[in-house]
Curated annotation (Swiss-Prot):
Keywords: Antibiotic, Antimicrobial, Immunity, Innate immunity, Secreted, Signal. The keyword Signal applies. It comes from Drosophila melanogaster. Disulfide bonds: none annotated. This is Diptericin A. One of its GO terms (biological process) is innate immune response. Residues 20-23 form a propeptide. Antimicrobial peptide required to resist Gram-negative bacterial infections, regulated by Dredd. Induction: By bacterial infection. Induced in fat body cells by sorbitol and galactitol, but not by mannitol, probably by activation of the imd/Relish signaling pathway; sugar alcohols are produced in the hemolymph by hemocyte-expressed aldo-keto reductase 1B (Ar1) in response to oral infection with Gram-negative bacteria to trigger a systemic response. It comes from the Eukaryota. Changing G73R: In strain: B141. Belongs to the attacin/sarcotoxin-2 family. The lineage of its organism: Eukaryota, Metazoa, Ecdysozoa, Arthropoda, Hexapoda. GO terms for cellular component: extracellular region.
Length: 106
């Protein structure tokens, strides 16, 4: 009898120490919007004895409005032809910016 009471009191003591109040906010934090890496594209090729041409382009979003409708991006590129009967061409550089507006759906 005394052993049963001792075990019951021990269980009550353990249960009271483990009983924590639940936190007020049990919801998960919202997932942040994805951060896309720099968008790079490239290519090249040529015929035998014709040299080799290649080009690289890139685009990066630099600003987006809070509502997501306005967006500004920067883009640039580089291209050149190497070798062939006329030798190397001058490098071709491209730099620009883009503005995008997304119309709301009515």
């Amino acid at each position: 009898m005394q052993f049963t009471i001792a075990v019951a009191l021990l269980c009550c003591a353990i249960a009271s120490t483990l009983a924590y109040p639940m936190p007020d906010d049990m919801t998960m934090k919202p997932t942040p919007p994805p951060q896309y890496p720099l968008n790079l594209q490239g290519g090249g090729g040529g015929q035998s004895g014709d040299g080799f041409g290649f080009a690289v382009q890139g685009h990066q979003k630099v600003w987006t409005s809070d509502n997501g409708r306005h967006e500004i991006g920067l883009n640039g590129g580089y291209g050149q032809h190497l070798g062939g009967p006329y030798g190397n061409s001058e490098p071709s550089w491209k730099v620009g910016s883009t503005y995008t507006y997304r119309f709301p759906n009515f």
